Amino acid sequence: MYAVFQSGGKQHRVAEGHTVRLEKLEVATGATVEFDQVLLIADGETVHVGAPLVAGGKVVAEVVGHGRGEKVTIIKFRRRKHHDKKMGHRQWFTEVKITAINA
């Protein structure tokens, strides 16, 4: 059984037991989170596709932890002017473990 749900403007395909990194959620570590924007639920033989959401669909997850991703380097450069600017960015994320998928 797997599901596709939406969180943080992105869509994630998950199954029970999977660990997923999502955009940062303001939830404490160890707390339970429910995602109700479920777009698709597949259970072996049957596939429930929402229009746009599956009625009564829910993905339940437990927050494993928070962290920051790898550094992305941004370089702005102007040719022939001896001008360059180097910046970096590390995006915050929340790691969750999927505990249940309810249709």
Curated annotation (Swiss-Prot):
Protein function: This protein binds to 23S rRNA in the presence of protein L20.
SUPFAM superfamilies in UniProt: L21p-like (SSF141091)
Pfam families membership: Ribosomal_L21p
Organism field: Shewanella denitrificans (strain OS217 / ATCC BAA-1090 / DSM 15013)
Keywords, comma-separated and alphabetical: Ribonucleoprotein, Ribosomal protein, RNA-binding, rRNA-binding
Subunit structure: Part of the 50S ribosomal subunit. Contacts protein L20.
Keyword rRNA-binding: yes
Entry keyword rRNA-binding: yes
Domain of life: Bacteria
Gene Ontology MF terms in the entry: rRNA binding; structural constituent of ribosome
Membership in a protein family: Belongs to the bacterial ribosomal protein bL21 family.
Cellular component per GO, a single term: ribosome
Protein name listed in UniProt: Large ribosomal subunit protein bL21
PANTHER family, sorted: 50S RIBOSOMAL PROTEIN L21 (PTHR21349), LARGE RIBOSOMAL SUBUNIT PROTEIN BL21M (PTHR21349:SF0)
Listed GO biological process terms: translation
